[in-house]
Curated annotation (Swiss-Prot):
Keywords: Ubl conjugation pathway. The keyword ATP-binding does not apply. Residues 67-150 form the UBX domain. The lineage of its organism: Eukaryota, Viridiplantae, Streptophyta, Embryophyta, Tracheophyta. InterPro entries: Ubiquitin-like_domsf (IPR029071), UBX_dom (IPR001012), UBX_domain-protein (IPR050730). It comes from Arabidopsis thaliana (Mouse-ear cress). Residues 32-61 are annotated as: Disordered. It comes from the Eukaryota. This is Plant UBX domain-containing protein 12. It holds the Pfam family UBX. The keyword Repressor does not apply.
Amino acid sequence: MLECQSMMEKLSPFVDVASLEIESLRRIKRPKRFSEEESEETENTTNSSNAVFGFPNLPEEPNRDMDQSVLCRICVRLPDGRRIQRSFLKSESVQLLWSFCYSQIGDESSERKRRFKLIQGFPGDYKNLYFGSNTTFEQSGLANSLVSVTWL
């Protein structure tokens, strides 16, 4: 055990120097400068972003005391790494999942404007979910599954 410890002590100066070098090589980000025309265009897209997405209104979460045969639980992994869960009725439209994910995405306006897609993962495979499908959670096979949100 002492050999491992002495080896780590000998390597520590190199690790510290490498991390400082990497930190100094990182590019300093400067804020973008926009002209007045570009800023007007971004304001127009910001106002219409909700209309473009057109997600349905998200109803309240069903009570967990309800019959479990009519409920399904969905776990969603967000792009920032968080995992969130919500219950839906199996008879509800899958489109509500997009509304739920959109409501959980960060508060920054830049993230709110970004388009995303939903992916259901299987061992060794995955399935893209499409907003246009009018299927229910039960019909789509999403009941009690994990869905990932990824940026387009």
